[in-house]
Design a protein with these regions (language model features):
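Class I (Rossmann-like) S-adenosyl-L-methionine-dependent methyltransferase catalytic domain
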Residues: 1-37, 50-85, 89-96, 138-239
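Conserved class I S-adenosyl-L-methionine
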Residues: 40-49
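A conserved beta-strand element that flanks and buttresses the S-adenosyl-L-methionine
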Residues: 107
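Helix-capping/helix-break motifs at membrane-protein junctions
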Residues: 116-117
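Conserved acidic residues
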Residues: 41, 62, 104
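A short glycine-rich, Lys/Arg-flanked "PGG" loop and its adjoining helix->strand segment in the class I
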Residues: 121-133
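Short catalytic micro-motifs in class I SAM-dependent methyltransferases
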Residues: 110-111
Length: 239
């Protein structure tokens, strides 16, 4: 995961335009809010990235913890949200020192594809310790086997056409094709899981999970899973 962390900590071209970037984070925030069960919930966004719309999520809960591995991004988060008393910024390492059973909802969105299977197992172990007995883990934007970059391109173009940044999207795709992102994706690859494999992986980590009806974010060809502590009842899902 380290090379991907370095990439996202750099001046990258993953977003086609400011409008694309802003809408991306707004949609994710809206989807996360859909999983918040009560206004007194404590929410953890694991490897949150720039989290530009995090204030909206914080408005829907009692506390939002933004955990981010990239030091540059983490510094910007601290500066951006310093006035917001409901938002805390932490490194992933700091999560290991947090109180057990202190979190109602953990969201890991668009993270698993950048981790090795062993790294993801370790992350599941860390967050499982933090989740309250009735809490939930939401693992979003999981890439499926045999669904390649062409589908990601189609999802982006559909999103752009609907949201009014098609010209920027086309230019952005050209830039991405020549960028370090494409080189990293070709060299390192992205981890992919079938529905069955992700549910089994979560089960081995001590969770009972099911696939949500819709994915977090704009890409309907990817998957989101909702998990609870094994034996805590059926996992719920947002619409």
């Amino acid at each position: 995961m380290d090379e991907w962390i370095d990439y996202y900590d750099s001046t990258h071209t993953i977003y086609a335009s400011k409008r694309h970037r802003d809408l991306h984070f707004q949609i994710i925030a809206k989807d996360i809010i859909g999983y918040i069960a009560a206004p007194d919930a404590v929410v953890l966004d694991y490897a949150c990235g720039e989290a530009l719309a995090a204030a909206k999520v914080a408005d829907a809960c009692s506390m939002l913890i933004l955990a981010e591995p990239a030091p540059g991004v983490r510094g910007r988060l601290i500066a951006r949200f310093a006035p917001n008393t409901k938002i805390r910024v932490r490194s992933l390492e700091e999560l290991k020192n947090m109180a057990e059973k202190s979190i109602d909802l953990v969201v890991m969105n668009s993270v698993a594809q950048y981790m090795t299977p062993a790294e993801l197992d370790s992350a599941f172990a860390v967050v499982r310790r933090l989740i309250k007995p009735a809490g939930r883990l939401v693992v979003g934007d999981i890439l499926r086997p045999k669904v390649g970059m062409a589908i990601d391109v189609l999802a982006l173009l559909r999103f752009a056409a609907k949201s009014g940044f098609m010209k920027d999207a086309l230019y952005g795709l050209l830039s991405t094709a020549l960028s370090e992102y494409r080189q990293l994706r070709t060299r390192l690859g992205l981890q992919r899981y079938s529905e069955k494999d992700m549910i089994a992986k979560l089960a081995r980590a001590g969770f009972s999970a099911s696939r949500a009806r819709r994915n977090i974010g704009h890409n309907p060809w990817r998957m989101t899973f909702v998990a609870r502590h094994a034996g805590a009842g059926e996992p719920g899902a947002a619409d």
